[in-house]
Amino acid sequence: MRLTYFGKIGDGNTSLLRNAGLAGLLSRSSTRKANLVNSLQMAEHRGWNVAEAHEKRSIHTDSIRLEVETDSGVTVVEGVVLLEKPRLIQVDGIYCELALSGFLIFMKNQDVPGVIGHVGTVLGRNKINIANFSLGRRDAPSAPGEPLEAVALVSTDELVPESVLAQLRDNPAVKFARSVEFRA
């Protein structure tokens, strides 16, 4: 895991920010409760490499970028606090923006016609209300003739069950779909 702090946010002691990020990551994969006090020790016990960097350049004055490497690859997210609310602003180099609160579907897909309609139809059929929908896509395809890669962040009024996520993945353009709950 690598945290990069941009702007003044990195000028002070960032240990609480680091530990909060670790606690969030550990909460999804550990039976032991991770918190601000024990998260660094838990990560080290698991053999995680935790690195921090401070940089002055960013589109946003103060932001935090998190890079996580797993067996399936590297995921990079960046966030800011706007109007006293944490917001995601970038996923794997694709800019999209959504408040990090409540329930969220995180989706990677090909930018082709019908994906947004598919998401709305599947959620509507399952009586799940969309509170907000944010899209972003790469500026260029990964290879000539390939569709652009896209990210969809869908805020919903309830946690989306795995059975509904599987219906989203039934569309061949949807490469990844996961439901996340952000707790205060």
Per-segment meaning from a language model:
Residues M1-G10, T14-A184:
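A conserved regulatory-domain signal marking ACT and ACT-like small-molecule sensing domains
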